[in-house]
Regions:
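Short gly/ser/thr-rich secondary-structure transition/capping motifs
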Residues: 67-72, 171
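Short, charge-rich amphipathic segments
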Residues: 21-58, 82-107, 151-160
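Short hydrophobic/aromatic-rich motifs at helix boundaries and adjacent loops
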Residues: 64-68, 89-92, 191-194
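Noncatalytic linker/hinge segments flanking ATPase motor cores
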Residues: 53, 126-135, 169-179, 226-236, ...
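Catalytic NTP-binding/metal-coordinating core of nucleotidyl cyclase/transferase enzymes
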Residues: 73-154
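Intrinsically disordered, glycine/charged-rich C-terminal tails and inter-domain linkers
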Residues: 1-68, 229-286
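A generic local structural motif
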Residues: 72-75, 218-220
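Catalytic beta-strand-to-alpha-helix segment of the class III nucleotidyl cyclase homology domain
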Residues: 144-263
Length: 286
């Protein structure tokens, strides 16, 4: 990573420090000399409780304050309704190693600090957190007053900065402080247009939620599953709608093969839907 890249995003580390301190991890890990030194060295970085995320070259564009129902559909009388959305599915691998070394309460605090920082980044770029699923985040970008292209860009920005955070901030903390392997974050992004996304209510009485019925929302999870460690996979609608430069996209290979490429996330009769690996590092350095 270039130094200029770190300088652009160093506020992310400050926010991560803040989230760690919120969890009072000093007390839980006080026997760790390395952790004590790490926290002592960060004392010079005074992070006020009210400090919010600020990312150079990316202005804040916060849209949603709550998890669950998308703000466009709080009024359930509007449902069912078709409306585009860009879906982000983020999964964190490797946190189980924490449970082999630390007690459950400590593991929960560490994981929450990581997830909280990821949530703040997604919200910073205009994302809406729809659901937390264990070590995974399911989120949306886009709303009725936002251009579709901007929604896709928001998703790409959020996912790229999260991968940057993992490689440059979390990796250092997990390996040098916690003494475990760094996390592996995989992200899938896909876009469904107006005629490809139906918003409606699922469930009964007081046990229900407003969510989407969309192949492309489902594919964001499948794309995440296809992604390699610390990478982002995007669906065909994403890279074709934005006409992303070829140098930011690459094909992946079928598992176990170094020659046969895996072009499609879904191949069924006449529906052949492509996927690409997105080079988030090169994107951020532009």
């Amino acid at each position: 990573m270039k130094i200029k890249l770190y300088n652009n995003y160093n506020n992310i580390e400050r926010i991560f420090y803040k989230n760690l301190r919120k969890e009072n991890l000093d007390n839980k890990l006080e026997k760790s000399v390395i952790h004590s030194r790490y926290m002592d060295s960060s004392q010079s970085i005074i992070v006020p409780e009210n400090e919010t995320l600020t990312i150079a070259k990316f202005p804040p564009n916060r849209f949603s304050e709550k998890i669950g129902t998308h703000p466009d559909f709080i009024d359930e009388s509007l449902l069912p309704k078709t409306q585009y959305i860009c879906s982000i599915f983020l999964d964190i691998k490797g946190s189980t190693r924490l449970a082999l070394k630390y007690d459950l309460e400590t593991v929960q605090k560490i994981k929450n600090a990581v997830l909280s920082t990821g949530i703040e980044i997604i919200r910073y770029f205009g994302g809406h957190i729809h659901r937390l699923q264990g070590d995974a985040i399911f989120a949306f970008t886009g709303h009725s007053k936002l251009l579709k292209s901007d929604a896709i860009i928001q998703a790409i920005n959020a996912a790229s900065v999260i991968q940057y955070m993992n490689q440059n901030i979390l990796k250092k903390y997990f390996e040098n402080v916690l003494g475990v392997s760094s996390l592996k974050i995989r992200i899938g992004i896909d876009f469904g247009d107006d005629d490809e996304v139906l918003w409606s209510k699922y469930g009964i009485d007081n046990i229900n939620e407003v969510t989407v019925t969309s192949l492309h929302a489902d594919l964001s999870s499948k794309l995440q599953n296809k992604a390699s460690e610390n990478s982002i996979m995007v669906g065909e609608n994403v890279f074709s709608y934005l006409q992303l430069p070829d140098d930011l996209l690459s094909d992946i290979y079928i598992k176990g093969s170094s020659e046969e490429k895996d072009y499609y996330i879904m191949k069924h009769n006449s529906f052949n839907y492509k996927m690409k690996n997105f080079d988030w590092s090169k994107y951020l350095e532009r």
